[in-house]
Amino acid sequence: MGDKGTRVFKKASPNGKLTVYLGKRDFVDHIDLVDPVDGVVLVDPEYLKERRVYVTLTCAFRYGREDLDVLGLTFRKDLFVANVQSFPPAPEDKKPLTRLQERLIKKLGEHAYPFTFEIPPNLPCSVTLQPGPEDTGKACGVDYEVKAFCAENLEEKIHKRNSVRLVIRKVQYAPERPGPQPTAETTRQFLMSDKPLHLEASLDKEIYYHGEPISVNVHVTNNTNKTVKKIKISVRQYADICLFNTAQYKCPVAMEEADDTVAPSSTFCKVYTLTPFLANNREKRGLALDGKLKHEDTNLASSTLLREGANREILGIIVSYKVKVKLVVSRGGLLGDLASSDVAVELPFTLMHPKPKEEPPHREVPESETPVDTNLIELDTNDDDIVFEDFARQRLKGMKDDKDEEDDGTGSPHLNNR
């Protein structure tokens, strides 16, 4: 096979009259700007007739189950909607063609019309809230959808079979420069004890990649007459839901309860290791996950990176993580072990994917090699060297097809029930 061509994703409308072509499905938020959404829509001229070709980009926050949508009231809020008249091109929508658009139009012909969207950087990243076992309908969370259709005007009601709908993702990657090493300490003075108990904890770094173990260094100086009976370490996910008002949900995603004790007038030091995995948290309804594309698994939601001065209220879901270290201290006295008090510190950290390495535009690959990254575009000088791949994933065993998903849904937790 020689060089791998430019990989382009396509999806056609159920009636086969429109097809949308996009260079990728993940669009990176670089904090100050977001990758533009550029593509083309190919339309059957006999179907188009005297109508116009519209493409819309919608960022929506679904916060309740679809089966509860009644009387025109929906548990969904559109955070951002942009419309482009792709044909005939409106003066305000005309933009210079990108390299990808030029090549697609050259290959597909004169009935391929370009569209480009700019995503504001203060919009949220794609996040899905994990559904419960009995939830039905679309999952709650923030998603982005590109929709193309032919109509006399934007207000015209469009049937699903006459339009193309594609879910894309807005993603962030870990910054190249990590923040300072997380450390925290606290001192607790107890009644009837002359000297205090001191707890100090630290992480080995500030940024962790998904699936990477987290090392927690715990140092206890117990100058009291109390006994530390137990040490509890937990990794917690915090999800700030910013909609009509702001609410915060927290959920432990990794825990260790050690029976390590610290006797009076002694010191203790140990490193604990925890690894937060989605596989260990499948039953937790409402847990924030990275936005999911059909037929692909996902992971715990990545930390949200905010630029300075960002309006937190416009953001749908803000995700952060902390490690909590808690000492369970026996109070002693007449009650003995029946009464205890806690001493705790928290260590915020960042959990994200690393930025993918950019590969050179040309790479010799053997015919038997399967491309690992199907989201990769490789530009070359051969305008005919374009590989089209269906936007919908290959059907996996046991997975429902698009029609089944529309009928049955994948489940959605209601925020009020979290």
Curated annotation (Swiss-Prot):
Residues 355-366 have a biased composition (Basic and acidic residues). Residues 353-374, 397-418 are annotated as: Disordered. It comes from the Eukaryota. GO terms for molecular function: alpha-1A adrenergic receptor binding; alpha-1B adrenergic receptor binding; angiotensin receptor binding; AP-2 adaptor complex binding; arrestin family protein binding; clathrin adaptor activity; clathrin binding; cysteine-type endopeptidase inhibitor activity involved in apoptotic process. The keyword Ubl conjugation applies. PROSITE patterns: ARRESTINS. Changing P121E: Impairs interaction with SRC; impairs ADRB2- and HTR1A-mediated ERK phosphorylation; no effect on sequestration of ADRB2. Residues 318-418 are annotated as: Interaction with TRAF6. Residues 1-163 are annotated as: Interaction with SRC. One of its GO terms (cellular component) is nucleus. It is found in: Cytoplasm; Nucleus; Cell membrane; Membrane, Clathrin-coated pit. SMART domains: Arrestin_C. Constitutively phosphorylated at Ser-412 in the cytoplasm. At the plasma membrane, is rapidly dephosphorylated, a process that is required for clathrin binding and beta-2 adrenergic receptor/ADRB2 endocytosis but not for ADRB2 binding and desensitization. Once internalized, is rephosphorylated. The ubiquitination status appears to regulate the formation and trafficking of beta-arrestin-GPCR complexes and signaling. Ubiquitination appears to occur GPCR-specific. Ubiquitinated by MDM2; the ubiquitination is required for rapid internalization of ADRB2. Deubiquitinated by USP33; the deubiquitination leads to a dissociation of the beta-arrestin-GPCR complex. Stimulation of a class A GPCR, such as ADRB2, induces transient ubiquitination and subsequently promotes association with USP33. Changing P91G: Impairs interaction with SRC; impairs ADRB2- and HTR1A-mediated ERK phosphorylation; no effect on sequestration of ADRB2. The modification Phosphotyrosine is found at Y47. Changing V53D: Inhibits internalization of EDNRA, EDNRB and ADRB2. No effect on interaction with SRC; impairs ADRB2- and HTR1A-mediated ERK phosphorylation; impairs sequestration of ADRB2. Gene3D superfamilies: 2.60.40.640, 2.60.40.840. Residues 45-86 are annotated as: Interaction with CHRM2. Keywords: Cell membrane, Cell projection, Coated pit, Cytoplasm, Cytoplasmic vesicle, Membrane, Nucleus, Phosphoprotein, Protein transport, Signal transduction inhibitor, Transcription, Transcription regulation, Transport, Ubl conjugation. Functions in regulating agonist-mediated G-protein coupled receptor (GPCR) signaling by mediating both receptor desensitization and resensitization processes. During homologous desensitization, beta-arrestins bind to the GPRK-phosphorylated receptor and sterically preclude its coupling to the cognate G-protein; the binding appears to require additional receptor determinants exposed only in the active receptor conformation. The [DE]-X(1,2)-F-X-X-[FL]-X-X-X-R motif mediates interaction the AP-2 complex subunit AP2B1. Binding to phosphorylated GPCRs induces a conformationanl change that exposes the motif to the surface. Belongs to the arrestin family. This is Beta-arrestin-1. It comes from Rattus norvegicus. The gene is Arrb1.
